[in-house]
């Protein structure tokens, strides 16, 4: 063995002697160079939705069959990777009228166009600072917040490395997110812990507190929540809305297929009077697959149980029919037909907690993604 080692050493030395001296390999410090700063530029993005929507078994109303067409163009001025300014418009054309949106519990207007998003975003260091009207900066399920509703106000997030994990702390204040002159004030805080790689196994836990102060909210947005009516015909909530939310998400692949499991539990600590025992809500979701590239597919199943005053029904998803006071399931499957363009079909089964009848909603969507 010793002779073999000596022979190998001798051959190595001989080879080195016959080989021109190579250029020394730079150390990691010498290899490093800073990428040139990003030049200011404009970015144009847009998405669109074409939807067939059918709701039936409504008991006291005729069945509804309608179409919805929406486009959202966005223009961002990107100053650098740490600062940008943006504006986004939304245009809708539906087969129903705007007067139908209230009775149909919609968060959108069937016909019209408006500027819905205008924001300034800065990213100094580990912080993200948003001001204006922007997308929801906190992690929230559709049971709690409809992500098509923009959030006028300000938000600050701080990402803190913690070994193999990260902790993100967010504080935000919003003013009047709903349409028709809403002046509701909302304060929210959240802590998110993330660990792992979603391509292997990732855990995400988010705890948040939401404080709502309703003001000048139109009667149509009281929906299924408990309320009283004053002598002028204006509605007033019976409960306050001080909501604590705990969201758990698990991401992992099965083969090459991504899987998301999500569980959301919420409790309103502001219920009172006849609403005292109607304070809890839960959502469970499984999503398998993805969309975006041709022939990508995605399957999802969602279960929701929401008591009457567990949350404010003015701001959560309108893809279901009732906004609170129900339990139900929604299942759907999507297929990408062109880059960033997919078709999705879904069916929803929903029952109000005080009624035996289950209503159904079928939606077929053609979606162009940002």
Model-derived regions: residue spans:
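Detector for outer-membrane/organellar transmembrane beta-barrel domains
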Residues: 198-328
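Outer membrane beta-barrel
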Residues: 65-212, 283-313
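Bacterial N-terminal signal peptides
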Residues: 4-14
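Beta-barrel outer-membrane channel/assembly domains of diderm bacteria
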Residues: 18-129, 158-164, 196, 328-338, ...
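Short strand-loop junctions, especially beta-strand C-caps/beta-turns
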Residues: 49, 134, 172-176, 266-268, ...
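Extracytoplasmic loops and strand-loop junctions of Gram-negative outer membrane beta-barrel proteins
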Residues: 54-58, 100-103, 138-139, 173, ...
